[in-house]
Amino acid sequence: LILTAKEGLAIDLCSGGNRAERKVTCLVDGDTGWERGVKWRLLDIDTPETFEAECDREKQIGEKAKLRLQALMAGGYRLADSGGKDRTSERRYLMRVILSDGRDAGQVLLREGLAQRWPNKGNRWCGR
């Protein structure tokens, strides 16, 4: 799978259905998005859940992670395909988001405390 770079475009937050059919580009949360109708997940990191959060703190940090990823990608990015898919039923493409300045967006989220390594056990945001 090859997806080209985007230069300085605002990335929408996802809404509505039929994203593959509509070929949308948007962010679901801090580690999942769609690029022209292809669903992807960030490789090697996990951000807090926003839809099925186990505690309020997880939801709050998850929202921060999503907005931070949106801001990072707005400066331009490219998706680097790892060649793999996740093991969930969704079979999302595992990608790295490489920012226009060469940084890996996932690593930025890790350094800022908005993500943890993936796969992992437990939920550090809810104290377990």
Question: Residue ranges of each PLM-predicted region?
Answer:
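Small beta-barrel nucleic-acid-binding modules, primarily SNase/OB-fold domains
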Residues: 1-128
